[in-house]
C-alpha cells in the first residue's frame, strides 16, 4: 500500500480532532466516504441510525463545511464529503511541500488524481504480478497502479515510451522497451486485466475521469481548493512537458 492523496483521507484527522463535531457525525462522515450513499435514507439504513438523527448530524457537518448536498429532482439528497476551506488551505500548503519530493513526477501526479477520482480504496503501486512475466527474460512486468479487485491497471507513458530519448543507450534498447509494453498489454488482456495508458496530456482531473474504465466506480468530487491545486499541478506538468519537448531533458515516467 502507498500514501494516499485523497482529500477525505487527508482531512479525516482534522475532523476527528474537531470538538465541534459529534461522535455520531464523525462516524457518519467515515461511512459516507466508504459507501457513497445515494440518499439520506440510504445512509440511515446503512448506519442503523434513524433518518431524523442522520439528517440532523449531516446538516451539522454541512454547516461546518464537511459535506455538500445536491438535491435532485427526485428529491434525493446526494451527499458529497469534503473539507472546510481552512482545512483545505492547510492541506494545500502541505501538498505543495511534499510534491517536490515526487519522482517520477508524471506518474505521481497520475496516482494522486486517481486517488481523488476512483472510488476503490485498495490498490497496489509499482507491483509485479506473478502471472505477468516477460517470456524472453523471465522477469515480471510492472504496473504503475493496479486495482486488483477490479482488474484494471494504469500505466503512465512518459515520452520515453513513445520515442527514443537520452534514457535509451541504443535503438535496440528503445525497441526492447516498446516490446515489453506490448507484451504487458497482451498478457494483461489474456488475464482479463484492462490496461489504461495515461500520457502527460491526460493529467487534468476532467481528462483522467474520461480515461477511467466503466468497471471502476467513480468518486464524488467536491472541486474545492485541494482538488483545484492538484489539477493545477497537472497543468503545470503539461506545460513543462510542452516547453521541454525536443530538448535533451531526461523525462520522467512509468517503469516498464
Positions of predicted regions on the chain:
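A short alpha-helical element within helix-turn-helix/winged-helix DNA-binding domains
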Residues: 35-50, 61
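Short, cationic-aromatic polyanion-contact patches
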Residues: 19, 39, 71-93
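Short Asp/Glu-rich motifs
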Residues: 63, 80, 206-208
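Short, hydrophobic-biased segments on the C-terminal half of alpha helices
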Residues: 55-59
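Short recognition helix of helix-turn-helix/winged-helix DNA-binding domains
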Residues: 1-42
